[in-house]
Amino acid sequence: QTAYNWSYVHTHAIGRSSYKERYAAIYRTDRVQILSSYVWSDSGDRFEREPQIVKLRHKQTGEDYTFINWHTIFGSTSQRRAEIAEIRNVYQSIQNSDSSDQDVILLGDHNRDANSNYWDSLKSLGVSNRVNDLTSINSSCGYASRYDHFWFQSNHTNEYSSSGRDYISNLCTFRNGISDH
């Protein structure tokens, strides 16, 4: 429990196989207004789990941001490569849909290091990863991989500050409390 009021938006269970996931965005109601939240329409069935798109407004500044919340398939190399190539199209489509709102942020568990050449097509848009730390927590309760990312174009998202990161004192307790794997 905190001194602040929180709320969330979430998706239905998403996934092609019997394994399904839900995406969610949790936010402080005194700071953020949700403008929209939906699951990306994937008519070509290019994603194992379609991204969640959340558009929000920071109440104090009036700035709008659009988040693409997405968990890349872990499957084969070719499956991952195909999904990562397609997320570029999603990013560009969202950015092109509203010329007044270019603050698009792609985030999530992307099952691939940001330095991989898989990301070259996204990087060609001027998008860069802003978190390149070990973030995934392994079974021995240590940091394991650089799969969790925040991608955006710094020329459009100039409010970004890299000065903060939450550190958790007991990774085992945290991991076991929020993850099923």
Language-model features: where?
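Divalent cation-coordinating acidic motifs and surrounding scaffolds
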Residues: 1-180
